């Protein structure tokens, strides 16, 4: 079902319709997120001053869109069954309206608990969104206690459509 979850209070219908239209966007294989989609998310994030989260499947299909507050977003549970050491097949892409691209402790917890393929943040820098910085974390293995080990990478590449 194509719906927007989360904190929709005070959000214009035109903005909600822009977000619903994102369900039609296909992220190319081999990309965490396309530059065009990242720029669109940055634009909407700046306009509403709230975090936005997308779930994207391995095939590039957007499966969930959630609006949060200005410093957090509630993430829905990832559907499907998987083994104890298997990832979900979903990457979570979300925005930080304050421009900080660094993954928070909450982001790393969500990465581990939901077994995301990746947790991606876009530190939105306005008014020139091409200056926004993207970082991402991934589960890179298991430790001796079979707990997930995460690693973060920050991309200083500027967004260009």
Label for each model-derived stretch:
Residues 1-30:
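Short, compositionally biased leader-like segments
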Residues 65-114:
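Short HxH-centered metal-ligating active-site micro-motif
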Residues 141-153:
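Acidic, Ser/Thr-rich peripheral helices and adjacent loops at domain boundaries
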